[in-house]
Amino acid sequence: MILPLIASLLLAVSVITDPSPIEIPADPLATLRTQHPRIMANVDDFARLKETLKTDPQASKMAQAVIRQADASLNKPLPMHILPDGKRLLSISRDVKNRIQALGLAWQLTGDKKYPDGAWRILQAAGNFPDWNPPHFLDTAEMTRAFAVGLDWMNEAWTTDQKEQICQWIIKRGLDPAMAGYKDPASKNGHQLRARHNWGQVCDSGIGMGALAIADMHPDEAREALRFALQCIQPSLSHYAPDGGWAEGYGYYGYAMEYTSGFLSSLDRSLGTDFGLSKIPGFSFSPDFPTYLEGPCGNYFGFADCGEREHKVSSLPWAGWAAMQFQNPASAQNQRKKAETYPDAIGLLWLPPAMDQSKISPSSRVKQFSKIGCATLRTKWGDTNAGFVGFKAGDNKVNHSHLDIGSFVYDVEGQHWAVDLGADNYNLPDYFGKKRWDYYRLRAEGNNTLVANPGPAPDQSTKADCPLTLCTDRGDAGLAIGDLSAAYPSLTSAKRGMHLANNGSLRIQDELDSGGKEATIFWFMHTPAKIEISQDGQSATLLQKGKTLRADLISPTNARFEKMEAVPLPTSPNPPGQMVNKGVTKLVVRSDFKHKETIVVDLTPEGGELAPLSVTPLSAW
């Protein structure tokens, strides 16, 4: 009977302690549309796509690429239950997901039975795994999504027995271990499914998509899992507020959004509603995040455990959905430009229509993501030679964070001058534990920021949360200031300002106060450029791919530029096994002072007008 079941569900869900702003109905399947397909797309969506292929050359080219991917998948070895690093099945889950999505879309576009036949062999192999590695629940969630798409997009091709078998794999390998975690919040899976970071969105979305796929055949199991998924995903979605920024950085923002967009679109196509999840404050601004974090050279501001060229600066297929969902034409066209280079099934499914670029409102040159303490400044849009700065303050306690408060990246004249090294190997000993701050790339010294009084301990406070105090376009320059004081407990005050002039020159200004104590400060900038330092040490020339950048040390006058290898300081820990930072050197300023110090470095592109030697206090910016 349904009513006793619903009563038990309400009791079970009540154990969740995370606040929930949206009330989930007792029977979320009340409006279920039983027709397949309904996971991310319905029959009308696929029909529209077929029509689009007749008139949109880019879409047609992408479709050919996806069909080639599907054909190649038919000849690849079947998936095996292997944990390559001893911990994760994730690479296997992702391979299954990508293959099934390509095969499913190829079936929808061609009707060729070879695609579901090949998909069945893959599903059968992965379905017969002993498990989908629930201790690392991302693996389970991604595989559940793959099976949801397989069941749904190729539903017409399956026999009744095949449909039931896929349902059973989804239930036993995906929903059952999820329910154990949902009903036991203190368990490992319980924590993973309730995570307030990317894990929460990926895990709950994958399970939610699995539940929606089987809902017509197994409504009781689907209803129970779906209610929990809808409830548990909300705390992580709340972290997009107020302006769409994501504290874990671009890469994990993209990972979370890939799954959230899949889930929300599946809710809409399956039930006609996402229960208001897409209206959670800040979420509608999320398409802005990758748009603004990408510099003119095509690199992303890769703070935290992210890379500057994450996913090969590839298509962001979910961005097409989000941009159209939230009517963000700039983001939509940004995705369309990328999608052709790295075509995939979802990128084609959600490919935004071509638009007249002249009808797209110009974006702001300056953008602040206030909650995460991140700002981007640029001189103009649509110019690969434009000046660009990514700058962050932020919270060192955030999942995947580095000790990178105060760090920045810098592009101008088509070159990426100040770079972020990104993450190290996740399988290094205790990478996410007590040894995390021993690894160079994760320490302040491995980022483009300050180190105060260096030693073996973490070189910023691991609990610091620092705000941006200014972010504005002044007309002649973009400005951002961060109060970094909480990151440096050995100082009484530390503030950093970024001044990006319209000619692309950048001033980095640091105002420090040691409270009367002797202090040593290192100023670091990692660069792939060749560094030549002047005889007096007051200036340096950076050379890269035929372009030149001049660095001038305006203050203090008694300091000098140096260059160092991108390796730990002699006083720092240096565990074995870390990545070698090949081709990267550090431009360095060292200052020993007592009381107050102001460090000002000007970076000027070749032919650019040098900034005035006078220094304006940050308080007067």
Residue ranges and their predicted role:
Residues M1-S8:
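Sec-dependent signal peptide recognition
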